[in-house]
């Protein structure tokens, strides 16, 4: 099993629209593609990324196929309307907390 670690900051003034998009489109969309969310962290204080999130897929080939799909690209394009400083990394899932 592999894990997709992602982080980003929400654009100032876009918080309501961002959370609406995440709940109604992004989370259901990535699950439909075969990526299972495992956690999401919202940073209130400090200098780190505002959002840290993780999701798993069965194996690296599956994850890469998902990330290369047009459906994933469409979801990412919509996400980028609400966020900045997007970063991601694919790692082997350990079952423990993992950071980008």
Indicate residue ranges for each PLM-predicted region.
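Short, solvent-exposed loop/turn elements at beta->coil junctions and helix N-caps
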Residues: 40-43
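Short, surface-exposed ligand-recognition loops at beta-strand->loop->(often short) alpha-helix junctions
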Residues: 9-21
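Short acidic/glycine-enriched loop/turn segments that link adjacent beta-strands
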Residues: 45-49
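Short, low-order "capping/linker" segments at domain edges
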Residues: 91-100
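Active-site-flanking beta-strand signature of metal-NTP-handling nucleotidyl enzymes
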Residues: 2-9
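An amphipathic, aromatic/His-enriched active-site/gating alpha helix that lines ligand/cofactor pockets
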Residues: 20-38, 56-91
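Residue-level signal for secondary-structure boundary sites
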Residues: 14, 61-63, 96
């Amino acid at each position: 099993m592999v894990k997709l670690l992602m982080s980003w900051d929400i654009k100032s003034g876009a918080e309501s629209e961002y959370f609406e998009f995440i709940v109604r489109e992004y989370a259901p969309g990535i699950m439909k593609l075969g990526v299972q969310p495992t956690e999401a962290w919202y940073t209130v204080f400090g200098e780190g990324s505002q959002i840290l999130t993780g999701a798993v897929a069965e194996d690296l080939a599956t994850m890469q196929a998902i990330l290369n799909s047009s459906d994933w690209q469409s979801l990412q394009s919509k996400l980028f309307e609400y966020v900045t400083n997007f970063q991601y990394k694919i790692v082997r899932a350990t079952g423990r907390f993992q950071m980008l």
